[in-house]
Amino acid sequence: MAGSSAEQAADYRSILSISDEAARVQALDQHLSTRSYIQGYSLSQADVDVFRQLSAPPADSRLFHVARWFRHIEALLGGPQGRDEPCRLQASKGRRVQPQWSPPAGTEPCRLRLYNSLTRNKDVFIPQDGKKVTWYCCGPTVYDASHMGHARSYISFDILRRVLRDYFQYDVFYCMNITDIDDKIIRRARQNYLFEQYREQKPPATQLLKDVRDAMKPFSVKLSETTDPDKRQMLERIQNSVKLATEPLEQAVRSSLSGEEVDSKVQVLLEEAKDLLSDWLDSTGGSEVTDNSIFSKLPKFWEEEFHKDMEALNVLPPDVLTRVSEYVPEIVNFVQKIVDNGYGYASNGSVYFDTAKFAASEKHSYGKLVPEAVGDQKALQEGEGDLSISADRLSEKRSPNDFALWKASKPGEPSWPCPWGKGRPGWHIECSAMAGTLLGASMDIHGGGFDLRFPHHDNELAQSEAYFENDCWVRYFLHTGHLTIAGCKMSKSLKNFITIKDALKKHSARQLRLAFLMHSWKDTLDYSSNTMESALQYEKFMNEFFLNVKDILRAPVDITGQFEKWEAEEVELNKNFYGKKTAVHEALCDNIDTRTVMEEMRALVSQCNLYMAARKAERRRPNRALLENIAMYLTHMLKIFGAIEEESPLGFPVGGPGTNLNLESTVMPYLQVLSEFREGVRKIAREKKVLEVLQLSDALRDDILPELGVRFEDHEGLPTVVKLVDRDTLLKEKEGKKRAEEEKRRKKEEAARKKQEQEAAKLAKMKIPPSEMFLSEVNKYSKFDENGLPTHDTEGKELSKGQAKKLKKLFEAQEKLYKEYLQMLQNGSLQ
């Protein structure tokens, strides 16, 4: 970079001050690497002064900048003989040289920052190996249907992954696990198995009623001991449902109803009491379940359902998927090394992590993510699992803060052989062993839900760093925010959740993703009707823009006509376009802030809409190339976010995901012909005043084409705009329009009715002679004068002058109304 002559002189003085010649030449080469000194370079006195300090160009080929510069200066001075002659900086007559060039200052490029739970700050993202990013994500524990809480994490991480890969161009290696060995799975598998066996035995009504009463006893104790209000409310709901189903069956048994009638009530009670009976059956017979296939059947089923849900949500599959059941040998080896390193100990066939020993080490820190939660026994016990917090298990630990690496299996639990006896992995060690096997001693990103920070992720960090004897197993820890349901806490254990399948019955995968994009990935998201309505409106807003641009691009024009002169409006819109692109980039660099990105994109579309509306009002064609560039950019961004399938060239695809046929390019030529034919027919019908043909034309637009997913938009004096829109969307629009028209008609009728009532009331008032208007108010007045004006109140007291004056005004007003009424009678204007 070339600076001013004064700056160059200062640089050269600094170089000349170096006493060692080799170091001086090296410094000169460094300086010259930032400047242009090719033919035509403008010679300065500082160049000459430094040149004269050198006897010859350097022999070292690595100092080629000095060598080229030396020969160039020598040539400008007229060869070797001119090196000691006075320097004439003015070029010889007729010879010109290029002026000195100054590069632009530029701006500091924006760097990606991610909110790192390890620091609770937005840290500059620096992968450990160039552009390669290693990423491990905690997957689901598969014992039930996937719900919107899962969607919150996996859609959010899918968006982050796509942005890192497709926008920032990182090479992302994404790993995810499936937890198919866990206390929840074991308990649920046993309960399902035992309940189905019980149902198949078809217990008589009297036996079922007895069993339900027996099951209710421990359930009632559990209810009385529950302090959490949400959990208590859930248990009370179960209790009430069981009672409501029990009473009809008891009545049926007492009344000796037919077997069919009793059986129907038995089935109702079985369904309502399933949770109650399952817990009771497990407590009495769970230890007798020994077939390992029972414990693998349940997670296999729900894992498959999970993958179907992720595909339906357009969530990319991981590069590697690990299952705990497939990594038991690696987990055993992982635990053994932790013990060998001095951070684990065996106790009664189980192995525990020694948190005190780990925390005392100068190399390690325990509780990196949530240090304030260390010692929280409730959270620690939840992390251990329901089957692992009995008094005998807790007594095996050296400290209550220690957690299980390996659990000795009890009767009724699956088991695998290991050096400490038959058992199964602890929850936290599963992720550590699988991630460590695939990603090694340190990964770039670890992701999971916010509620996994402690104890799960803190324990993962501890045991992994104990294994690798390092302090950097994870560089960036990302946690997605909670999801609430209409402001209420969502919990599978509280049975307060919406499954992904149920959510997809109401809204499309794109609409759900747009809702997530319109919120920060790390903050709480409220899944509610308001949230989804905002997403629907955003989708409609963007889609209308894409449809309008497509219509403009379909207008016939020759090749040269595609490139039109830019007026001030195009220049301004293009300036705004690039400004919004910069704003989008800055937002993505700022912790992948998709909420701001979506608003910037909305603002850009609003500017385009204003531009198109102005052109339409002026009967001028909008600039095709500019609008296409903007629409393609927006499409590109929505593709990156996973809101548009890859095959769509511009805007949202028509026909839904998985449609191989390019519906738009196939049917649009035919629709365009139909539109032009319809316009011609309408024109003739208007001229000939054939109302029936115009009505048929409107019916085609309003009733027939929407059923096929086609919208015709008529604009006075302009060609009909043809748009392909999702059929359901059009039918909803049609229904909404119908409701709006009905509401308008209802309001009009209501206004007419009110007006009629007001006129009737006014007429009724006008009919009253002023002399009679107060006579009926005996609850207010006791005496009246000859004109009917009150003089005394009900107690016989004479009215004050102020009261009398007020009544006099009312009397005179009524007198005027009554005269109008008499005049109307005389004129015959009353119907």
Swiss-Prot record:
N-acetylalanine PTM sites in chain numbering? 2
- Which residues of the sequence carry a binding annotation for L-cysteine? 139, 179, 456
Describe cofactor binding as the record notes it. Binds 1 zinc ion per subunit.
Catalyses which reaction(s): tRNA(Cys) + L-cysteine + ATP = L-cysteinyl-tRNA(Cys) + AMP + diphosphate
Q: Where does Zn(2+) bind?
A: 138, 431, 456, 460
Q: Where in the cell is it found?
A: Cytoplasm
Short sequence motif named 'KIIK' region, residue ranges: 184-187
| Class of enzymatic activity (EC top level) | ligase
Question: Which cellular component appears as one GO term in the record?
Answer: cytoplasm
Record key words, sorted: Acetylation, Aminoacyl-tRNA synthetase, ATP-binding, Cytoplasm, Ligase, Metal-binding, Nucleotide-binding, Phosphoprotein, Protein biosynthesis, Zinc
Q: Which CDD domains match?
A: CysRS_core, GST_C_CysRS_N
Q: Which GO BP annotation is one of this protein's? A: cysteinyl-tRNA aminoacylation
Tell me, in one coarse class, where this protein mainly resides: cytoplasm
**GO MF assignments:** ATP binding; cysteine-tRNA ligase activity; identical protein binding; metal ion binding; tRNA binding
Residue stretches of biased makeup (Basic and acidic residues): 736-762
Enumerate the HAMAP family for this protein.
Cys_tRNA_synth (MF_00041)
Subunit composition and interactions: Homodimer.
Q: Entry's PANTHER family?
A: CYSTEINE--TRNA LIGASE, CYTOPLASMIC, CYSTEINYL-TRNA SYNTHETASE
The role this protein plays is: Catalyzes the ATP-dependent ligation of cysteine to tRNA(Cys).
Name of the protein? Cysteine--tRNA ligase, cytoplasmic
